[in-house]
């Protein structure tokens, strides 16, 4: 079964970012015995592999602090067969063979980086909260992008939301565990991957951890707080910004899958 098993952020301080996600969301270090790299710092909720990837002076793609890419567990052959049925040519590029988890990569029709791995990302099946269960992608054409992920990765459409006042349109897809929102005319200005979403047992508990955890910020950096949106949003009501400024949604009920 094709499944989302990986997300990655680009950061200028991977130690600080992994410390934050460990203290606040209970993510643990995932040791990759094959990849000798100080840039890649893998952590996990037990199911999904999350890479806090340090930006290096020389990288194969333009780099900035952001939520950078998504990874699917699927074979090259299956992925290539599905890509061949798409209405434009998309070619797989082999990832560097340096011990990293993914085998191949490509850009989706709107330029978002997607990685694939036949053997997965070194994680198991875990259902204990908190769990990283959602991301949102800015879409120029949410219908077409949804068709792509349905075709190539067998994702199912589970929900739609249209907001007439802002002409925001969102399609929510699922692989059975992980949710992806494709949002056209998004209220978040960031292009590409716009946010991460954690299914949590209690938002109050996350708030308590933010207050009482050991330090994960530096002097004069603003305190991280849980914020709230109005109901006319394609995203969850509660969210925060991680130490790099990335948006992280919080939900006690989770996302429809």
Per-region residue spans from a language model:
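Ordered, small/hydrophobic-rich secondary-structure cores
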Residues: 7, 28-96, 100
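Core segments of cupin and vicinal oxygen chelate
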Residues: 1-2, 8-54, 136-179
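Exposed loop/turn and edge beta-strand positions of beta-sandwich/beta-sheet ligand-binding modules
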Residues: 3, 66, 100, 131, ...
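N-terminal beta-strand motif that seeds the catalytic metal site of vicinal oxygen chelate
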Residues: 1-18, 67-70, 119-146, 158, ...
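Short acidic/glycine-enriched loop/turn segments that link adjacent beta-strands
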Residues: 35-39, 98-102, 164-169, 190, ...
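Active-site beta-strand termini and strand-to-loop segments that position acidic
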Residues: 41-47, 106-109, 172-176, 240-243, ...
């Amino acid at each position: 079964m094709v499944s989302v098993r990986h997300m990655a952020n680009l950061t200028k301080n991977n130690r600080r970012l992994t410390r934050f996600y460990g203290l606040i969301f209970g993510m643990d270090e995932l040791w990759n015995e094959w990849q000798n790299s100080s840039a890649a710092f893998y952590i996990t909720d037990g199911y999904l592999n999350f890479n806090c990837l340090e930006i290096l002076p020389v990288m194969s793609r333009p780099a900035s602090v952001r939520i950078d890419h998504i990874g699917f567990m699927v074979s090259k052959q299956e992925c290539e067969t599905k890509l061949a049925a798409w209405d434009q040519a998309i070619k797989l590029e082999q990832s560097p063979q340096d011990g990293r988890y993914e085998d191949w990569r490509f850009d989706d029709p709107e330029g978002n980086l997607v990685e694939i791995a036949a053997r997965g990302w070194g994680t198991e099946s875990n259902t204990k909260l908190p769990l990283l269960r959602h991301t949102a992608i800015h879409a120029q054409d949410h219908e077409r992008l949804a068709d792509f992920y349905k075709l190539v990765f067998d994702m199912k459409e589970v929900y739609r939301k249209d907001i007439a006042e802002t002409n925001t349109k969102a399609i929510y897809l699922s692989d059975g565990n992980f949710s992806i929102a494709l949002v056209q005319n998004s209220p978040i200005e960031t292009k590409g991957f716009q946010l991460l979403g954690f299914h949590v047992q209690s938002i109050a508990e996350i708030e308590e951890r933010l207050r009482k955890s050991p330090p994960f910020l530096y002097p004069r950096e603003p305190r991280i707080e849980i914020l709230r949106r109005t109901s006319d949003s394609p995203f969850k009501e509660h969210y925060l910004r991680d130490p790099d400024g990335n948006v992280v949604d919080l939900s006690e009920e989770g996302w429809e899958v």
